Amino acid sequence: MLGRALRPGWLGITRTVVKKPSCGSYFNRTFQTAINTTMPPMQEGMLSTMMMMTATATRITGTVSEPLNGSNIVMQLDSVMRKRKKKMKKHKLRKRRKREKAERRKLSQGR
């Protein structure tokens, strides 16, 4: 739930991501060449994960520093919760009907 809230695209905040071209493809490409020439595969994997971590960290700090109205986030989360509740209700109802139908079938077969 929170992961979705922290993802900038989901909240409609895309400007902060565009502002930082350092985590773009050009940066990755230069990094890749440096890795391939100097490191064995295991360290390469570790480095890529570190890079990912730093990229996400910068993105999150970017979104936090930007003034965004908290009510909007709350509204979106609220709607998500409402949707989930509705789905659950529907699911439970369907399950109950199925069970009742199965019971009726058993009763009719027993006769």
UniProtKB/Swiss-Prot annotation:
Chief place where the protein resides: mitochondrion
A GO cellular component annotation in the UniProt record: mitochondrial inner membrane
Membrane topology of this protein: Peripheral membrane protein
Keywords: Membrane, Mitochondrion, Mitochondrion inner membrane, mRNA processing, Ribonucleoprotein, Ribosomal protein
InterPro entries in alphabetical order: Ribosomal_mS38_C
Residue stretches of biased makeup (Basic residues): 82-99
GO biological process entries: mitochondrial ribosome assembly; mitochondrial translation; mitochondrial translational initiation; mRNA processing
Pfam families reported in the protein's UniProt record: COX24_C
Compositionally biased region (Basic and acidic residues): 100-111
GO MF annotation terms: structural constituent of ribosome
Nucleotidyltransferase in keyword set: no
Location in or out of the cell: Mitochondrion; Mitochondrion inner membrane
Sequence segments annotated as region (Disordered): 82-111
Subunit structure, as described in the record: Component of the mitochondrial small ribosomal subunit (mt-SSU). Mature yeast 74S mitochondrial ribosomes consist of a small (37S) and a large (54S) subunit. The 37S small subunit contains a 15S ribosomal RNA (15S mt-rRNA) and 34 different proteins. The 54S large subunit contains a 21S rRNA (21S mt-rRNA) and 46 different proteins.
PANTHER family xrefs: AURORA KINASE A-INTERACTING PROTEIN (PTHR32035), SMALL RIBOSOMAL SUBUNIT PROTEIN MS38 (PTHR32035:SF3)
Reported function: Component of the mitochondrial ribosome (mitoribosome), a dedicated translation machinery responsible for the synthesis of mitochondrial genome-encoded proteins, including at least some of the essential transmembrane subunits of the mitochondrial respiratory chain. The mitoribosomes are attached to the mitochondrial inner membrane and translation products are cotranslationally integrated into the membrane. mS38 is also involved in the splicing of the COX1 mRNA.
Protein name as catalogued: Small ribosomal subunit protein mS38
Native source species: Saccharomyces cerevisiae (strain ATCC 204508 / S288c)
Source organism phylogeny: Eukaryota, Fungi, Dikarya, Ascomycota, Saccharomycotina
